[in-house]
A protein has these predicted regions:
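Acidic/histidine-enriched active-site and ligand-binding environments that engage anionic O-linkages
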Residues: 196-205
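ATP-dependent carboxylate activation and anion-phosphoryl transfer catalytic cores
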Residues: 28, 49, 53, 72, ...
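Glycine/aspartate-rich loop-and-adjacent alpha/beta segment that forms the canonical ThDP
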Residues: 219-222, 558-563
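Single conserved hydrophobic/aromatic residue that forms the stacking wall/gate
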Residues: 1-8, 13
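ATP-binding N-terminal substructure of ATP-dependent carboxylate-amine bond-forming enzymes
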Residues: 21-180, 189-196, 415-561
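Short, solvent-exposed alpha-helical "recognition" segments
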Residues: 10, 14-22, 267
Length: 563
């Protein structure tokens, strides 16, 4: 409004285009030419568009929780493939901490905001033959529709396919047509409709806004009052911004990254997540090849993947997340019509450069023409484990409880011929402190006690001392596990926090209720105290189980590093 008041009208503002200046990497000490440009409103333009075939790649933007440097991996490998194919490769990105914004990566780099106006300004100057929006994560994908509506040629997965995958109504129609099951759910645009939908679906429900990355504002709720509070305070809900309400199914979570060329689908590997549904996939430990699902489940997953890749109209990379329940029923959680954060991991684990293969597909080279004539290659004999890394100690007050909203800030990979050793390497590399002695502090939700009992017994039989809050401690004692009882904060005692601060506690295991929706303030205080005192803490019993497998397998000594 200020600018309109100064220059007269919005059209007058849009008639003023920026020019591009070259960044001087030598601070005027020496003559330098680097194709690294920024925009400014001056007169002389230093970026001269060449008359040659060119492809523009949209980067992933600033690194934040939910969208890390893993997405930049796909951008960089795409640029290399584009250059090798004889095109001029142009990148738009605005994060100086990534490889894609190294001026030696692409033929031209524009350090610009990833918003429609700034991207269009570059496109109007360069006139690329096509723009790739599916290799820069959700930030780039969100630009596809507004760019295409302005006449830009989007190559690879187009806007129609993106809409099929990300629009709830379109996606449900597609799944119904393909006879692929998904958890019962509904998109709602106001609070009362949300309450009615949850009642019809059945609690607990998973609620989340549409078109988000990293599970932002995603939550499992078990009661109507929780749902009302969430819809009032956690998200903006209206006709343009619906909230998705899905039935929460407790089961294994499985993930694939695939490539579709319109005729065939290639799935280099199936990854199984250690933590069950309810923990964001980016915060889960991911294992390739899968370690507990049956061959039948794998066949179903591959069948659904083929149908979805072709049915949506994917051209390039896509990612699918599945739920496998106790009866081995397979459900679709979501399809992401773009590169995902697991592409670097799966590329390294399988030996297939997924971003390179997908970029060739986008440029018109089919999978068969690339020598790929199988949907699912033979699995590797090594185990590969991707473990999340967290920065809770640097994020004051953040709850370390793992939930549908992503919280990890990095990841590490371990691999070995033996599964527990691969897990050990990944956990150690991600910053988990492991000890095979000491004390385990346990505080469990009532619904988790039966499942946790054999795990706590394994700690006890390994020689660990067990301490617990009153309810958990009495339960363990009743089942023959010697336990020292610690009073809760709600009992006007800080002894459990003092015990954690004292330094003798090796592990804290803390879970909270999902099915009942009852959460206690004690849990948050216990978790924060563990984090602030560098005590290894787990909020998922699935993670505890793999930790025990590691502790029972690993002995301190010299072991070979496999090539």
């Amino acid at each position: 409004e200020i600018l309109i008041g100064l220059v007269g009208s919005e059209m007058c503002i849009r008639d003023r285009f920026p020019v591009y200046k070259m960044i001087d990497t030598c601070a005027s000490e020496f003559d330098s030419y680097v194709p690294y440009f920024y925009s400014t409103y001056e007169e002389e333009n230093e970026s001269i568009a060449e008359d040659r075939k060119k492809i523009l790649v949209l980067g992933s933007g600033p690194i934040r929780i939910g969208q890390g440097v893993e997405f930049d991996y796909s951008t960089v490998h795409a640029v290399k493939t584009i250059r090798n194919a004889g095109y001029e490769a142009i990148v738009i990105n605005n994060n100086p901490e990534t490889v894609s914004t190294d001026y030696t990566t692409s033929d031209k780099l524009y350090f610009e905001p990833l918003c429609v106006e700034d991207v269009m300004n570059v496109i109007e100057l360069e006139r690329p033959d096509g723009v790739i929006a599916s290799l820069g994560g959700q930030t780039a994908v969100n630009l596809a529709e507004p760019l295409e509506s302005r006449g830009v040629t989007i190559i690879g997965t187009d806007c129609e396919a993106i809409e099929k995958a990300e629009n709830r109504e379109s996606f449900e129609k597609l799944l119904a047509a393909l006879s692929i099951p998904q958890p019962k759910g509904q998109a709602v645009t106001n609070i009362e409709d949300g309450v009615k939908a949850a009642a019809a679906i059945g609690y607990p429900v998973l609620v989340r806004p549409s078109f988000v990355l990293g599970g932002r504002a995603m939550q499992i709720v078990a009661k109507e009052e929780q749902l009302r509070q969430y819809l009032k305070t956690a998200v903006e809900i209206n006709e343009e911004k619906p909230v998705l309400v899905d039935h929460y199914i407790r089961g294994k979570e499985v993930e694939i990254d695939g490539i579709c060329d319109g005729q065939d689908v290639f799935v280099p590997g199936i990854m199984e997540l250690v933590e069950r549904t309810g923990v964001h996939s980016g915060d889960s430990i991911s294992v390739y090849p899968s370690y507990s699902i049956s061959d039948h489940v794998k066949e179903v997953i591959l069948d659904y993947t083929r149908r979805l890749g072709l049915g949506i109209g994917i051209r390039g990379l896509f990612n699918i997340q599945f739920i496998v329940d106790q009866e081995e029923n397979v459900y679709i959680i979501e399809v992401n019509p773009r590169s995902s954060r697991t592409v670097p991991f799966l590329s390294k684990a399988t030996g297939y450069s997924l971003a390179d293969i997908a970029t060739r597909v986008i440029l018109g080279i089919s999978l068969k023409e690339q020598g790929i004539d199988t949907c699912y290659p033979e699995e590797k004999s090594f185990w590969y484990v991707k473990a999340p890394a967290f920065s809770f100690a640097k994020l004051n007050g953040m709850d370390a409880y793992l939930s549908p909203e992503m919280k990890s800030t990095g990841e590490a990979i371990g691999y070995d011929r033996k599964f527990p050793r691969a897990m050990y390497k990944a956990l150690i590399a991600s910053g988990v402190k492991m000890q095979n002695y000491g004390t385990v502090m346990v505080t469990l939700a009532d619904e988790d006690k039966e499942e946790a009992l054999p795990l706590i017994r394994r700690f006890y039989e390994m020689g660990f001392n067990i301490e617990a809050t009153v309810g958990t401690g009495e339960f363990l004692k009743a089942h023959g596990i010697r336990t020292r009882i610690r009073r809760k904060l709600s009992e006007n005692s800080t002894e459990i926090l003092e015990a954690i601060r004292s330094g003798y506690v090796s592990y804290v295991i803390n879970t909270r209720a999902i099915l009942s929706g009852v959460h206690y303030e004690d849990g948050l205080a216990i978790r924060r105290t563990a984090i602030e005192n560098n005590v290894t803490m787990f909020t998922s019993l699935d993670t505890v189980k793999v930790l025990l497998d590691v502790l029972e397998e690993i002995t301190i000594g010299v072991s070979p590093l496999y090539a």
